[in-house]
């Protein structure tokens, strides 16, 4: 084989490797806006609430409307198909270049090399958003990273990543769990009056979430921005149940991981893919993303936060809405996330 043939073969190999790597994630690159030069990393892998729909839809808005580069990682099968709840989440090296981490996870247990990079981000105080089940992001981790599990028992890290970074975990016995009948009762959220002027709540009006409410008792240094009410049905405008007092539904805080730099965090017990059909819920999440990056000046009450491209969320349950989709299927701004609803 000649040197030319060797060079050509080598070049082809690296091109194929690059293409294979790029195929396991989706990237949306904004052109103009305050987010120019900044990178948001979204990681979606939960079993029920369609984080694989929420994350790319918010990523498109942040890229198109604000100019960020947004990379979305997904739980996947070995064959590269999107598998909600999978602990195989390729692309974590993107976290090294991330300015913001946006999480929608539930009970995952990635390998140690993945967790090592995740921890490095936390040590530098990188801003973090966690939606819904991300309070119990990790379960089943073994060895040196087991303390991140939602039921982590270390005295200095009780409640694992969820409690110590986001401010809450999953512990129904201590008041952090389902509140009302999920799939039967929807949720209304209301801004805490004292926080009407908080940047995260700027321009936020009515908030209706289809996913059922959670109860929560955020860490003491949390600022509660919104509380919930359990509704008597799934309908917008349904009456709240009188025997269900309001619970914290969205809050901000700062965290410091293992003596590292201080970082900002936002958590909401809502955020399912149908929840963000509510403009109020969506605006709060987008505002929070900017707040976490200390970009309060870019939060405008009347900013355009409309969806970019077709968005047809599926109703949450444990049966995956998709079984044959790859990240590349939602490249660009015009592809449906994830598939359009069938005509009725």
Where are the regions that the model predicts?
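Proline-centered loop/turn at the N-terminus of a beta-strand
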Residues: 127-129, 223, 264
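Extracellular ligand-binding/catalytic regions of CAZymes and related secreted enzymes
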Residues: 23-35, 54, 64-65, 93, ...
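Positively charged n-region of N-terminal signal peptides that target proteins for export
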Residues: 1-5
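Stable alpha-helical elements in mature extracytoplasmic
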Residues: 36, 54-58, 94, 114-118, ...
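Bacterial N-terminal signal peptides
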Residues: 8-19
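Helical hinge/lid and interdomain linker segments adjacent to catalytic or ligand-binding clefts
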Residues: 26-29, 41-43, 47-138
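Active-site rim elements
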Residues: 45-48, 184-189, 197, 201, ...
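An acidic, glycine-rich "communication" segment
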Residues: 36-37, 131-238, 301-344
């Amino acid at each position: 084989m000649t040197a030319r043939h060797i060079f050509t073969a080598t070049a082809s190999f690296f091109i194929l490797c690059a293409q294979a790597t790029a195929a396991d994630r989706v990237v949306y690159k904004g052109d103009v806006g305050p987010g120019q030069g900044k990178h948001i990393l979204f990681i979606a892998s939960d079993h029920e609430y369609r984080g694989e729909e929420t994350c790319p839809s918010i990523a498109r808005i942040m890229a198109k409307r604000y100019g960020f580069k947004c990379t979305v990682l997904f739980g996947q099968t070995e064959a590269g198909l999107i598998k909600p709840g999978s602990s195989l989440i390729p692309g974590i090296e993107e976290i090294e270049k991330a300015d913001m981490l946006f999480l929608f996870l539930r009970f995952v247990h990635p390998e140690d090399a993945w967790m090592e990079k995740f921890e490095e981000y936390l040590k530098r105080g990188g801003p973090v958003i966690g939606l819904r089940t991300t309070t119990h992001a990790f379960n089943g981790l073994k060895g040196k990273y087991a303390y991140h599990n939602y039921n982590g028992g270390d005295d200095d890290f009780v409640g694992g990543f969820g409690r110590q970074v986001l401010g809450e975990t999953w512990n129904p016995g201590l008041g952090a769990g389902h509140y009302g009948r999920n799939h039967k009762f929807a949720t209304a959220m209301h801004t805490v009056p004292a926080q009407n002027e908080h940047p995260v709540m700027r321009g936020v009006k009515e908030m209706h979430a289809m996913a059922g409410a959670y109860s929560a008792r955020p860490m003491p240094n949390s600022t509660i921005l919104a509380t919930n009410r359990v509704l008597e049905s799934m309908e917008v405008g349904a009456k709240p149940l009188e025997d269900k007092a309001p619970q914290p539904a969205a809050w901000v805080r700062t965290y410091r991981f293992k003596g590292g730099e201080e970082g900002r965090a936002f958590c909401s017990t809502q955020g399912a893919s149908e929840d963000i059909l509510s403009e109020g819920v969506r605006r709060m999440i987008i505002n929070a993303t900017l707040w976490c990056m200390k970009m309060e000046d870019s939060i405008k009450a009347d900013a355009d936060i409309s969806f970019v491209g077709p968005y047809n969320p599926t109703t949450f349950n444990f049966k995956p809405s998709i079984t044959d989709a790859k990240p590349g299927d939602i490249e660009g701004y015009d592809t449906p996330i994830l598939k359009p609803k069938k005509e009725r």
